[in-house]
Amino acid sequence: MATIDVAKERVRRTGPRELSVEVTPRYRLMWGLIRAVVRLLFDVRASGLEHWPKPPFQLVANHHNGWDPMLVISVVPVEPRITWFGPREANFSRGFKNRVMAYFGGMIPYNPDRTTLTSAVRAVRGVFEARGVLGIFAEGRIGFREAQLLEFEAGAAAFAVTSGVPVVPCAIVGSTDLWFRKRVQVRFGPPIWTDAVRGRAARLALDARIRAGVAALLPDTEPRLPRRRPLAFLTDLLNGADDIARRRSGPR
């Protein structure tokens, strides 16, 4: 019985050891499919791609919708590859978005109940060693205001600092409420360099700079919703049940 319990614990604590961080044929297929579907459904525009440094680097973005990773992928080149760090995702075998991203190797799951921190850190290091891009939604959960950021989780730039790679701020504007052919903008800011950051105070200051960099890319005011919003169900199509409940529960 004890042997079975140990085996179950090993399975429960597994991490993303087999994560592929190369631009594989499978990833190219995912990139092409996502790009085609997202651009069919929405009018997605990108700005600031010229700010991207040579990889590896870390992308820090706001988070308004379950569509956000795919919206970003739809406007960036197939190389360098973006791998998303998903600390809030408890089960990548459930939900359409999670299954698609997990199948194509597009996310690093990290949940304290399921994944060891060591294996997650190893996976992140693999992304940087392969000269890839690590994407993080630093708020840790979905927010519902276009012009505001939630508080960033502590250590949003910890991986970048540890590896000495730059951070690129990213703002996804227009994904809070979605409908057919809705315009969504993916904005990238100038890179923030981390190689000279030392000590806790410097890391806290870096986190503040990154948050300010993302905030500077957001609109000044909340948008007004039009009366006609065809296929408005797209808003919550890829959101989890908890996020849908929060959206519908009252003030944002």
What are these regions (language model features)?
Residues 2-26, 55, 118-252:
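Non-catalytic C-terminal accessory region of glycerolipid acyltransferases
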Residues 26-27, 33-63:
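Helix-to-loop junction immediately C-terminal to a conserved catalytic motif
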Residues 18-41, 93-105, 178-181, 238-242:
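Alpha-helical membrane-targeting segments
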Residues 46, 93-95, 118-121:
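Structural motif corresponding to alpha-helix initiation and N-cap regions
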Residues 42, 80-82, 105, 132, ...:
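A structural micro-motif
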Residues 53-114:
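Catalytic core of membrane glycerolipid acyltransferases/transacylases, capturing the structured
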Residues 37, 77, 101-102, 127, ...:
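A generic structural signal for well-ordered alpha-helical segments
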Residues 23-24, 45, 87-88, 113-114, ...:
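A generic secondary-structure micro-motif detector
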